[in-house]
Amino acid sequence: MAIRQLSETLINQIAAGEVIERPASAAKELIENALDAGATRIEIATAGGGKALLRVSDNGSGMDAADLELAVRRHCTSKLSETLEDIRTLGFRGEALPSIGSVARLSIASRRRDSAGGHEIAVNAGKVAHLRPAAANPGTIVEVRDLFFATPARLKFLKTEKAEAGAITEIVKRMAIAFPAVRFVLSGSDRTTLEFPATGDDHLARMAQVLGKDFRDNAIALDAVREEISLTGFAGVPTFNRGNSAHQYAFVNGRPVQDKLILSAIRGAYAETIPSGRHPVAVLSITLDPALVDVNVHPAKSDVRFRDPGLVRGLIVGAIREALARDGSRAATTGASDMLRSFRPGFQPQAQRPQTAWSAETSPFRPYQPTTGFSERPQASFDGLSMPTARAEPPFSPQPAAADTTARYPLGAARAQIHANYIVAQTEDGLVIVDQHAAHERLVFEAMRKALHSKRLASQVLLIPEIVDIPEEDCDRLMQHAAELAELGLAIERFGPGAIAVRETPAMLGEVDAHGLIRQLADEIAEWDTASGLSAKLEYVAATMACHGSVRSGRRLRPEEMNALLREMEVTPGSGQCNHGRPTYIELKLSDIERLFGRS
């Protein structure tokens, strides 16, 4: 078969297959063109999930007649001169408009700000109509109808109208986050679905518009520089997490990307703080010399290639971990919101309340009896909190002292322990409820990790060794890693077939459930299959030990023990969540409590 030159229409249709995969791809290209034109207001209208209609209107610089004629021709662009090494605009390929025009019905109306009138041009399945004058406001309106009507086979690969509309919505959200000074409006066939007013330079306000005000309340600012690569943005506290990674946004030199390296770095930064199956919320913006990143490795420009990927990953992981450590005692405010929503009024109006005879015997209420909220019996010593930074508070008094300053601490002053598991503390503007086991577990883990890194993890010799019966294969695995476990203060040895003798345990754990600890460690080592050693997993082992050595649920604490726990939480990084990523405390503001009682 002879080789022949392809027609211009077929070439454009092939290009469309690379650049325009779905309506959202077309929307992305058109929005990028509007942003490159300096628009401050962009309106997107769709019908049929973008297949029947996609219209993008902007108030940008506009085009004159000559520019309009070139805009629908391949490889014509105002954004690229001679090199691909210094790309500073969003769109640059010079293929989007002719590619769209080859598979759809495309019309463009545009007018420059300094022109008295505008012009319009149309492209129908690759056939360009004559340019004509048109009434138009300054800016550009691009309208795409019947996308892929010229290539019906492509329609089979599109998803439902709802799914395609959702993809367009996601594109608009990403663009809106990247450009807070631009007003974005997205409307469907019958209503406005999104509207993001311009917020100027206030990036966090725009993120609150897109991600919700909960993100603003639970975000930690990022600002780091490494070898002329800067990282800014916001990362959610670990307890503010989601069931998927859809709430992770990354931008490189202002360009929205979905780069695997960046997403992997975000996961790595949160690896020890979020439960399995949950994902952090983060918005990252990386700025670097355009020569250090290739944005042309993918037709849709969604992936990039960094010249030094290790440097970028290290910058992201380090910046997020440093921010979490700096503000690590915070827990997500959404816990309080969820709790408030779960409350229901516990009374009935007088008119609806059944009238029954009342007696002291039948009433669910009991006469008032003064109580301090604590057990009056002597308590065991709080061995688990023997860390030097913990400060004991004065003995609790049911009558608040005039000079009570403990409520001025971020986590307040302990007022009661309920169900022998939760500490209720009073702050200056509300109250805090702390899960004592989860909180102490995190404190012990952080102390163990610090001691592990400094090689000063002390152990305590058991007066009588604990003998733990486990399967022979588990014995073999544990003994294979006995030296590494000894680094954590856990000394074990064989004690006959199917048995392990525990002779030493980490001193900071106090009294340890050796049987439960050994069995869980055996299960985890089997799951990890770490034949080469536990060195990469020592912190996970420390987390397991911390869980077994922390204050258990059901243990009653004295007031000074509870206040010592609160003070230690305030100075410990990551204390807002336990080792499994669950929150260690929930804060209720006084305004929230008053709202529950209808006093707002």
UniProtKB/Swiss-Prot annotation:
Keywords associated with the record: DNA damage, DNA repair
TM region positions: none
Gene Ontology terms, MF aspect: ATP binding; ATP hydrolysis activity; ATP-dependent DNA damage sensor activity; mismatched DNA binding
PROSITE patterns in the cross-refs: DNA_MISMATCH_REPAIR_1
Chain positions covered by the region annotation Disordered: 348-375
Polar residues bias: start-end ranges: 349-362
One GO CC term on file: mismatch repair complex
BP-aspect Gene Ontology terms: mismatch repair
InterPro entries, alphabetized: DNA_mismatch_repair_CS, DNA_mismatch_repair_MutL, DNA_mismatch_S5_2-like, HATPase_C_sf, MutL/Mlh/PMS, MutL/Mlh/Pms-like, MutL_C, MutL_C_dimsub
Any Pfam family: DNA_mis_repair
Family according to the record: Belongs to the DNA mismatch repair MutL/HexB family.
Stated role: This protein is involved in the repair of mismatches in DNA. It is required for dam-dependent methyl-directed DNA mismatch repair. May act as a 'molecular matchmaker', a protein that promotes the formation of a stable complex between two or more DNA-binding proteins in an ATP-dependent manner without itself being part of a final effector complex.
Protein name: DNA mismatch repair protein MutL
Annotated source species: Rhizobium leguminosarum bv. trifolii (strain WSM2304)
Taxonomic lineage of the native organism: Bacteria, Pseudomonadati, Pseudomonadota, Alphaproteobacteria, Hyphomicrobiales
